[in-house]
From Swiss-Prot:
Gene name in the database record: gcvH
Lineage: superkingdom: Bacteria
Protein name per the record: Glycine cleavage system H protein
Native organism taxonomy: Bacteria, Pseudomonadati, Pseudomonadota, Gammaproteobacteria, Oceanospirillales
Residue ranges crossing the lipid bilayer per the database entry: none
Keyword flag rRNA-binding: no
Purpose: The glycine cleavage system catalyzes the degradation of glycine. The H protein shuttles the methylamine group of glycine from the P protein to the T protein.
């Protein structure tokens, strides 16, 4: 069974969002998503400074099974990426909620967070 931390918000496209409390969020993919993908071998990170639009592709994760687009869960600007994934994409499998975040985004509108699912809502989508 997939781990679904209560302190995060979720998109139904399997991204998690951590509200950093300063107008920024940290984004990654869920345990359920990495489990479906299998062993991750490559992560295409967005470029810092890129404007992202909620529900549009902003990253890519490749595994031994498939390549999967990663969708921005909020509108904003990429302010930081997790360069550790360039050398260790397997972190996505090993620690999807800890060391394997993909990007930090400066929110265009904090109300975007209200459109995301809580842990119970996300759990219902993958049940």
């Amino acid at each position: 069974m997939s781990t679904i931390p209560e302190n995060l918000k979720y998109a139904d496209s399997h991204e998690w969002v951590l509200d950093n409390g300063d107008g920024t969020v940290t984004v990654g993919i869920t345990d359920h998503a990495q489990d479906l993908l299998g062993d991750v071998v490559y992560v295409e990170l967005p470029e810092v400074g890129t404007e992202v639009t909620a529900t549009e592709q902003f990253s890519l994760v490749e595994s031994v099974k498939a390549a999967s687009d990663i969708y921005a869960p909020v509108n904003g600007e990429v302010i930081e990426v997790n360069d550790a994934l360039n050398d260790a994409p397997e972190l996505i499998n090993e620690a999807p909620f800890e060391g394997a975040w993909i990007a930090k985004i400066k929110l265009s509108n904090a109300a975007d967070l209200d459109k995301l699912l809580d842990a119970a809502g996300y759990s219902a989508t993958i049940a």
